[in-house]
Design a protein with these regions (language model features):
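Acidic/polar surface patches and capping/hinge elements
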Residues: 39-446
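N-terminal secretory signal peptides that target proteins for export/translocation
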Residues: 1-15
């Protein structure tokens, strides 16, 4: 079997950081009892999941924003929706805003309006889709003063996020210019494309102080024992042909080869619906997961841009130049899946999975009835070549998810193991920072 370097470390790292926070949160949740929001039972939480689905269709399907760029845009929408809801329900602290709406306002109208206005501002080409979704949302809400107040407040919530993100550095003309040298990233086959969305490495984060706040130390040196071990592991277990992978390992590798960011949003919608989250908790779940996920991508791109470490396919092809007598070159080697067009270290997927799973675990720990440390996430993959696709896997804990994600990127042949292990630690740090500073419960709030 493949050596599972790092999975145990991730589990221990997760458990240490989780135990105290989860126990405290569970005790707080149990002590709160029924809230004003729960007692009045008026707000329909489906507006949150409905607009999350519309957001994905707009950003991914219509605009073609994928990978880390897609979840970056999600954060614009989910932060506005979150503010629009909790500014009325008074359940959680506002995100970088201090304007609350009237308690009599409709949070459904506010949420729908905030999502609609943000999406229409940035993606006007989707107006037909957005107009139809907005009309459908408003049709479910009785006409009257509450609805009008909600619409007005939702407009203010959207305008605030648009102002807040002005001049954040997105789409800046940044390129990665590095020398051709051992250990240095270069475009990979078959596309030989330049680094994708390099501006993400320097864009203003949503919750972090800077993109480099959690920048890790450098990857293992080319002549180190760790590099040698990981080189030979990915060369053996990540090869497209003649590998030592088992069928189960290949299936895991393929499963994570196409965990689209849109599919992950579907996992969150499923969780919110299954657990019957109210409108405030649902808005908080999406905001915490997406803003932490977005910042994990920014942090990953910062480190990728800073270290510009080569991918396994380059390392294996050019091993004769790495100065390591224990690595052997193979000019015909190819990975199981196509290598993405950006540097190896750290892994973007593992960073994202860690940030989202940590956020979900912490948010759900405040919901009565949640098993401490539980993730309870259903994730569906539509990857080409995956037997039985679309295929859904259930992950009971974040540690289980991260173990699979880390191994998958090695078995896919696109990452050295350290890139995945370090990324998982980074994503957890990003999420902890986000939830330690934002989305906090208002004591004695509704």
């Amino acid at each position: 079997m493949s050596p599972d370097l790092g999975a145990g470390r991730i589990g221990r790292f997760w458990k240490r950081r989780t135990a105290a926070a989860v126990i405290a949160a569970a005790l707080l949740a149990a002590s709160i009892g029924g809230t004003v929001e729960a007692r009045r039972g008026a707000a329909d939480p489906s507006v949150i999941t409905d607009w999350n689905a519309t957001m994905v269709a707009t950003i991914v399907v219509d605009a073609g924003k994928a990978n880390a760029e897609g979840i970056f845009w999600y954060s614009f929408v989910q932060s506005a929706v979150y503010n629009a809801v909790v500014g009325i329900t008074h359940r959680y602290e506002l995100y970088k805003w201090d304007v609350r709406g009237p308690r009599s306002a409709s949070p459904e109208a506010a949420a729908a309006t905030a999502a609609y206005r943000v999406l229409l501002y940035y993606f006007p080409a989707s107006q037909v889709r957005l107009d139809a979704a907005y009309a459908a949302s408003l049709a479910k809400i009785p006409d009257g003063r509450s609805k009008r107040q909600g619409i007005r407040y939702g407009k203010r919530a959207a305008a605030h996020i648009i102002r807040l993100r002005a001049g954040d550095g997105r789409n800046a003309p940044i390129t990665l210019d590095v020398p051709l040298a051992a250990g240095v990233w270069r475009p990979t086959p078959p596309a030989m494309a330049p680094m994708l969305i390099p501006w993400l490495s320097q864009v203003r984060p949503f919750t972090l102080r800077s993109p480099s706040q959690f920048r890790p130390g450098p990857p293992p040196a080319l002549t180190s024992p760790t590099y040698t071990t990981e080189f030979n592991e990915v060369k053996d277990f990540g090869s497209k042909t003649g590998s030592s992978r088992s069928d189960a390992q290949t299936q895991t590798a393929l499963f994570f080869s196409d965990i689209a960011i849109g599919a992950l949003q579907g996992s969150l919608r499923d969780l919110a619906t299954r657990r019957g989250l109210n409108i405030s908790d649902s808005a908080r779940l999406f905001a915490a997961a997406d803003l932490a996920g977005s910042d994990s991508g920014i942090a990953a791109w910062d480190a990728k841009f800073h270290y510009h470490w080569w991918r396994p396919i380059t390392a294996i092809t050019l091993a004769a130049d790495d100065g390591n007598p224990d690595t052997a070159a193979d000019g015909l080697w190819a990975p199981l899946i196509t290598t993405p067009p950006y540097p190896d270290y750290p892994s973007g997927l593992c960073n994202l999975m860690a940030a989202v799973s940590r956020s979900v675990t912490r948010v759900m720990s405040t919901i009565p009835g949640t098993v401490p440390g539980s993730l309870d996430l259903n994730i569906t993959s539509v990857a080409a070549g995956l037997p039985g696709a679309p295929l859904t896997r259930h992950y009971a804990t974040a540690a289980d998810l991260l173990t699979d994600a880390i191994n998958a990127r090695v078995w896919s042949g696109i990452h050295f193991r350290t890139a995945d292990v370090v990324a998982a630690q980074m994503g957890t740090q990003v999420s902890n920072w986000a939830l330690d500073h934002y989305f906090k419960r208002i004591r004695n709030g509704d």
